[in-house]
Amino acid sequence: MAPFGGKSLADVVSGIGGNGVGGALAAVAAALLVRLFAGPGIALLPEDEAEDDYAETEDGGGDSIRPVTIRWRNITCSLSDKSSKSVRFLLKNVSGEAKPGRLLAIMGPSGSGKTTLLNVLAGQLSLSPRLHLSGLLEVNGKPSSSKAYKLAFVRQEDLFFSQLTVRETLSFAAELQLPEISSAEERDEYVNNLLLKLGLVSCADSCVGDAKVRGISGGEKKRLSLACELIASPSVIFADEPTTGLDAFQAEKVMETLQKLAQDGHTVICSIHQPRGSVYAKFDDIVLLTEGTLVYAGPAGKEPLTYFGNFGFLCPEHVNPAEFLADLISVDYSSSETVYSSQKRVHALVDAFSQRSSSVLYATPLSMKEETKNGMRPRRKAIVERTDGWWRQFFLLLKRAWMQASRDGPTNKVRARMSVASAVIFGSVFWRMGKSQTSIQDRMGLLQVAAINTAMAALTKTVGVFPKERAIVDRERSKGSYSLGPYLLSKTIAEIPIGAAFPLMFGAVLYPMARLNPTLSRFGKFCGIVTVESFAASAMGLTVGAMVPSTEAAMAVGPSLMTVFIVFGGYYVNADNTPIIFRWIPRASLIRWAFQGLCINEFSGLKFDHQNTFDVQTGEQALERLSFGGRRIRETIAAQSRILMFWYSATYLLLEKNKPKYQKLELLVDNGETGNSGVQLDKAEVDQTEKPEDDDINQPLDDQNQTSDSDDELDEIRPFVLEGL
């Protein structure tokens, strides 16, 4: 007899009864499986080969760093509002320069555009149809699109796999990003050097931790983020408010680390709100922003105090210079009078610095440039051809996923206790059911509850965890560490043993307590059905987590979607009575197939006590009332497997579709004929051009008619000392 009841495997998987839904799901899953295994290790950008910053010095982890100077000019970023037809400027004609060996801090009040400018320079500004970004960006004197370079971007949120130690986190990062380090000894030596360099030796073997598991401190997590970014020896380091959420001591240690990295030859750029005095003293250069406009750019220390002192704004003694500068360039919204006076002061300072910086020009005028396809994506993966293959990535990620899943003691203990507790409760309610007519309804109710409980437990666990993990994966994939296929497959396989344990516990306790069909084979099939259902629910949770942006949204969408599947699960609405427009839902409902399989397993061959001829005498008659007659368990398992593959395929597609996309920089045109072609950043003289009209920010960089309005405004401001600092 042929397997699967005389049908081929393809026939079984493609659907039941020849329905089109099953065939479509199987086709999508098959296509995605081919894509999953056929994909390259790393997707490389198809542009021309870019010059490697480490072509001569890189040896799989060497410390040689090629100096990189980044110059930006007239960066303008606007956000349009279609409903009100208004435009809000996030950045207006911002210019500046970051040099190797120097720590540059972007400072300003909240909402001044610090993070926006940092994201623009790093090519990390999220893509939006409402955003318009323009300006000039050069790396070592060349347009950023023609020369790629290694960069590190340390975000405010420190996201890690919580169950790994600090050393393991760095080791996996080194293996994924530096496949050329083949021996474990070299990798361990490289990781140990990073631990020593970042001051993480004391916590190297400590668990990173999270909100549930106590781990390393916030400052240590920030330094670990830096260490992970330094794996590939980047030339440029971007840090978005690295001291946020840290106490004074930890903030000091983090900034000391950034200062040392700058002294090692890195170009370090960070955004920071209002640092303490000792932190401000570590800055080599600063850029001051207010309401998206440039107020000062140049050396830090006493130079900005001297500059603003020339206009009568004197910093009192024993006052933190950073606090003084922050108050000076902020608008006070406490009253209409303070708003007017502070705005007048800020606008005058902006105009004064714009005029001052436009007095010194570039030695060589910039030539005409056009928009490039990838001008704002200077990623390392565009210039490095990865040598690690698909399977190497898979086994590394499988090891990491298994360590994360198996070590998650608190979560696993809670899941185990809930599985046993729910089984005990249900077993007590349906204690040792007999063979009476009323037991038929009890058995159906118990099997429906078992299917719902198994699915909801797996779903809620996945949607509560995966959105956070997706953020980590998106960051690692954006660095070119690995591709999506190995990650998704490794995660699936690593979680099979842990995921199977809980439905097995549930079945082992519930089955004898309720006295379901008392044969070993039926018990094995019961556990097998709920286990496959648990895997399908987890796959559905992955899809929900890949579809929505946050854990909160996933927790709202996942159970709501599962409720729809419960309604069409075969117990509340008979499949034969389902309206035609909704008949596809039972076919896609994992609850329906699990309930059907459990009913077939329980009722087949069962005899019930009866007194009347119209009573249900056999289990087959009970199955007919549910429209499950003539079905087989293997068909339900095949349907569940088909649904599982569909959800995994949907997860793959959504993760590919929703991967981070970044805004392109539209390069402004400069024909070199105007006198205002730029500035040479020397000491306090900063690259900045005149402020364009608000209604035309994209005009060519031509000379603007300068007036003495700003001078008049400054003359009207009487010199004063900021009080109350």
Swiss-Prot record:
GO terms for cellular component: chloroplast; chloroplast envelope; membrane; mitochondrion. Signal peptide: none annotated. It comes from the Eukaryota. Residues 682-691 have a biased composition (Basic and acidic residues). SMART domains: AAA. ATP binds at residues 108-115. It is a multi-pass membrane protein. Residues 70-316 form the ABC transporter domain. InterPro entries: AAA+_ATPase (IPR003593), ABC2_TM (IPR013525), ABC_transporter-like_ATP-bd (IPR003439), ABC_transporter-like_CS (IPR017871), ABCG_dom (IPR043926), ABCG_transporters (IPR050352), P-loop_NTPase (IPR027417). PANTHER family: ABC TRANSPORTER G FAMILY, ABC TRANSPORTER G FAMILY MEMBER 28. Belongs to the ABC transporter superfamily. ABCG family. Eye pigment precursor importer (TC 3.A.1.204) subfamily. This is ABC transporter G family member 7. The lineage of its organism: Eukaryota, Viridiplantae, Streptophyta, Embryophyta, Tracheophyta.
